[in-house]
Regions:
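Solvent-exposed loop/turn segments at secondary-structure junctions
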Residues: 55-59, 83-86, 102, 108-112, ...
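Sec-dependent N-terminal signal peptides of Gram-positive bacterial secreted proteins and lipoproteins
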Residues: 6-29
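Active-site beta->alpha N-cap acidic-glycine motif
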Residues: 33-126, 130, 137-138
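C-terminal domain-boundary segment and adjacent tail
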Residues: 36-44, 71-73, 85-86, 201-244
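Alpha-helical scaffold elements lining the catalytic groove of polysaccharide deacetylases
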Residues: 61-64, 110-137, 148-189, 202-205
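Structural recognition of the beta-strand scaffold that forms the well-ordered cores
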Residues: 49-52, 76-80, 101-104, 140-143, ...
Length: 244
């Protein structure tokens, strides 16, 4: 079966190289003319979507989710709570080794709006420190708990701030079928989907969503990859809800 992940990888490498070499140019159809009068068929880019998960890690559910994503060759983005990382270092390292993007979701899931700079750093900077101790230095993007951040927080963020465009509120009733239906009815190219990897129902929903959208031709990427693929240069302190 065609691997959409590999299609995306090679499409991003092949097409710019051909354009740079003058061997193909954009055209109205799938075939672009070459300098020799022939043509090179350039496949259309598939629709892209980013699955994101908050509030973990949690041993049982996050492990099962990682297993399911690996089986499907899917990358996702995990926003971790700092005080839940201790004792889960092996799980967090596995996330990184599997190619997932890892970000910050505060230290203890407190709202990070209306904080002093010192308290903000205890929530965000402290969590980055925990992640760096486990993974080494890295760009750990921020997702504020409850999606709430004030202007001061944006100035202090030290990274892009990631929200979402599709929220099935999976925490409310933990109804897998409803969550899947909600996501499938709202998703589109460039969507950022919010789920939580601490519920068994959400893990079930995520894998069903992955299968359904893969069947529709979607390709799953991290948030950073999504913005890059859409030509968006992420900026520190800027909020991103989708890639359009």
């Amino acid at each position: 079966m065609w691997c959409r992940k590999k299609f995306f990888k090679y499409w991003r490498v092949l097409v710019p190289a051909l354009l740079l070499a003058g061997l193909c140019r954009p055209g109205p159809g799938p075939a672009a003319e070459t300098g020799g009068g022939g043509s090179v068929t350039v496949p259309e880019e598939p629709p892209l979507v980013a699955l994101t998960f908050d509030d973990g890690p949690r041993t049982s559910t996050t492990s099962r989710l990682l297993d399911g994503l690996a089986l499907r060759e899917i990358q996702a983005t995990f926003f971790l709570v700092g005080d839940r990382i201790q004792g889960q270092e092996v799980l967090v390292r596995r996330m990184a080794e599997d190619g997932h993007q890892i970000g910050v979701h505060s230290y203890d899931h407190s709202c990070i709006s209306d904080l002093s700079r010192g308290d903000f750093d205890l929530q965000v900077g402290r969590t980055r420190g925990v992640l760096s101790a486990v993974l080494g230095s890295g760009d750990f993007w921020l997702r504020p708990p409850y999606g709430i951040i004030d202007n001061a927080g944006l100035r202090w963020a030290g990274s892009p701030v990631v929200l979402w465009s599709v929220d099935p509120e999976d925490w409310k009733d933990q109804d897998t079928g409803r969550v899947v239906g909600s996501v499938l009815s709202h998703v589109e190219d460039g969507s950022i989907i919010l789920l939580h990897d601490i519920y068994d129902s959400s893990v079930d929903a995520a894998l069903q969503i992955a299968d359904a959208l893969s069947g529709q031709g979607y390709c799953f990427v991290t948030v950073e990859q999504l913005l890059q693929a859409k030509g968006i240069q992420p900026q520190d302190g800027t909020v991103y809800r989708c890639a359009k």
